[in-house]
């Protein structure tokens, strides 16, 4: 983002090697921000936001690549959700974008046509040849999720699997999970 605008880092957990999600009370939001971006689940560090940041009238933009479809999400709280399919939806090369209507077309003048969501919205997501195999696989995944109880069932399943792993790590005299318990990912369980 620094190539296109002034960036304000509103919060960081660098002080503890990125092992927790900074509390909302510690965030220093800019009143004139164009948007606030965060990553819902940090894959390598295994830190997950189990809450949605409150940004008032400032659009909230979220990278959900590693935890989309892992639990129900109220998309109305976001200006934009984007996710690469390669973690939970299908093969690499497919990206899901859920954009609030009032944000369509708000781009810098030099934005390439393929990076302007208005282009895709006006062409029903088929401005160019879509990745048909990826879409087919994603459709199979969506059907499987529905047949297995939907997103609420996926969340239950993920909580149960993560609880088993974390219980083992917490009682281990050898392995350690460095992530703050309240912010542990349900999708990625790092340990040393």
PLM region descriptions:
Residues 19-22, 46-51, 70-76, 92-95, ...:
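A short secondary-structure junction signal
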Residues 85-166:
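Active-site C-terminal subdomain of aminotransferase-like
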